């Protein structure tokens, strides 16, 4: 279900740094373009040794009108980037995988952060979204889900349905 971010999250308010009689100098604070969360979820981590989960959010970028995803937290530890990743970048990586099994490391290219857990945690999120499934060869290899294209299109259509609902 879609939600607005809470009041506790960042607000775009300029901060007055210094002032004289003629001019007020302000410092630009970063803008949060992801105030409209359209889906939140959790996905089981890839390792068979744990029952812990990775939590993710999907939001609409308020200027680009594009879907982005981020890993918001995880159970049991493991550092990861909380950067927002364009969903179309992830689907572009998945689109070229074809029928062959692939490693989580194919996801490294969508991150600017370099945490070792990023690719694996994002692959877990993609499994949670039903885009990919475990390969028969290994718990750490993936293949596209049989209904990948349908699931991808449904996911990408969230931006259309949410913007029409406003």
What does each model-found stretch correspond to?
Residues 112-128:
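Short amphipathic alpha-helical interaction segments
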Residues 146-166:
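Short, amphipathic alpha-helical interaction segments positioned at domain boundaries
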Residues 138-145:
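Minor-groove-contacting beta-hairpin "wing" of winged helix-turn-helix DNA-binding domains
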Residues 5-82:
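Long, low-complexity, charged/polar intrinsically disordered regions in eukaryotic proteins
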Residues 75-93, 128:
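A structural signal for long, well-ordered, hydrophobic/aromatic- and basic-residue-enriched core segments
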Residues 86-90, 96-111:
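Short acidic, hydrophobic short linear motifs in intrinsically disordered regions
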Residues 127-138:
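A short, conserved structural fragment
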